[in-house]
UniProtKB/Swiss-Prot annotation:
Belongs to the AIR synthase family. Homodimer. It is found in: Cytoplasm. It catalyses: 2-formamido-N(1)-(5-O-phospho-beta-D-ribosyl)acetamidine + ATP = 5-amino-1-(5-phospho-beta-D-ribosyl)imidazole + ADP + phosphate + H(+). InterPro entries: PurM-like_C_dom, PurM-like_C_sf, PurM-like_N, PurM-like_N_sf, PurM_cligase. It comes from Shigella flexneri. This is Phosphoribosylformylglycinamidine cyclo-ligase. The gene is purM. The keyword GTP-binding does not apply. The lineage of its organism: Bacteria, Pseudomonadati, Pseudomonadota, Gammaproteobacteria, Enterobacterales. Keywords: ATP-binding, Cytoplasm, Ligase, Nucleotide-binding, Purine biosynthesis. GO terms for cellular component: cytosol.
Length: 345
């Protein structure tokens, strides 16, 4: 016989019962995202999904992403209900720029100590993002790892798979001199530049919960969920000849627009075509951030830029604005052998 205390997994910091409670809590919201192609439900070792029958030569498109240090701001302000939307948006917006329809999404949620309420809020946000983009939340991993994260801090990552007809892949190869650039307005900084945002808050001594901007707390502007453009863009692609789409994420204008430009072309952006949302003016002023750095770090009010032939512009703008987007002509494509792929003037 021994008088040693019997240890359990819970004694080591892993609460399986909490994990099971979380699964029970989220089943309903996850079920709402289900597409007809998905087979089975939550709890299997793997998720099964058939390809939609309308595709003749389907090509799968995949992407994975996180939300960067926007997550730190959300944790500090104890606002967990929209960070899941951000996570989905960062993945599905990357897929749709290639013409792909998102099919299914998986998430990874890791924490030192699982708080069921917090995790449920995050995953409910993920389900909402999936509803907005028309994809199914088919599974995920909730990892409780004591000693790896401080307290109830957590991290999230997402993985998405979509499908596009092989002949309809959008890769920028059709972009040519004279194409027009259309902008889609952003909902705020989206999920990029938050290390600089947090540094500006620190240096300025500003409390985002008590500082007001345009009649609401600065925190509301900074934590506004990333806009999901999937449904609007998919309809646009069906009805308009789209040559390229750039998702303005990390690297801003300078790095993301060139990713979809063929050689010997240059994007010329008309800075007078829009006004920065007030949150970007605040960030620039409070942080004394140079203009070039603003365009490299933030989207400055532009979430996506679409290149298309000039005759298609009016139709595209009408369709996008009818679908609730804030869309406008932001520039043109010029033939150029300059090393400067993007000009903002």
């Amino acid at each position: 016989m021994t008088d040693k205390t019997s240890l359990s997994y819970k004694d080591a910091g892993v609460d399986i019962d909490a994990g099971n409670a979380l699964v029970g809590r989220i089943k309903g919201v996850v079920k709402k995202t289900r597409r007809p192609e998905v087979m089975g439900g939550l709890g299997g070792f793997g998720a099964l999904c058939a390809l939609p029958q309308k595709y003749r030569e389907p090509v799968l498109v995949s992407g994975t992403d996180g939300v960067g240090t926007k997550l730190r701001l959300a944790m500090d302000l104890k606002r967990h209900d929209t960070i899941g939307i951000d996570l989905v948006a960062m993945c599905v917006n990357d897929l749709v720029v290639q013409g792909a329809e998102p099919l299914f999404f998986l998430d990874y949620y890791a924490t030192g100590k699982l708080d069921v309420d917090t995790a449920s809020a995050v995953i409910s946000g993920i389900a909402e993002g999936c509803l907005q983009s028309g994809c199914s939340l088919v599974g995920g991993e909730t990892a409780e790892m004591p000693g790896m994260y401080h307290g109830e801090d957590y991290d999230v990552a997402g993985f998405c798979v979509g499908v596009v007809e092989k002949s309809e892949i959008i890769d920028g190869s059709k972009v040519s001199d004279g194409d027009v650039l259309i902008a889609l307005g952003s909902s705020g900084p989206h999920s990029n530049g938050y290390s600089l945002v947090r540094k500006i808050l620190e240096v300025s001594g500003c409390d985002p919960q008590t500082t007001e901007l345009d009649g609401k707390p600065l925190a509301d502007h900074l934590l506004a969920p990333t806009r999901i453009y999937v449904k609007s863009v998919l309809e646009l692609i069906e009805k308009v000849d789209v040559h390229a789409i750039a998702h303005l994420t990390g690297g801003g204008f300078w790095e993301n627009i060139p990713r979809v430009l063929p050689d010997n072309t240059q994007a010329v952006i008309d800075e007078s075509s829009w006004q920065w949302p007030e949150v970007f003016n605040w960030l620039q002023t409070a942080g004394n951030v140079e203009r070039h750095e603003m365009y490299r770090t933030f989207n400055c009010g532009v979430g996506m830029i679409i290149a298309l032939p000039a005759p298609e512009v009016d139709k595209a703008l009408a369709l996008l604005n009818a679908n609730g987007e804030n869309a406008w002509k932001i520039g043109i494509i010029k033939a150029s052998d300059s090393e400067q792929r993007v000009v903002i003037e």
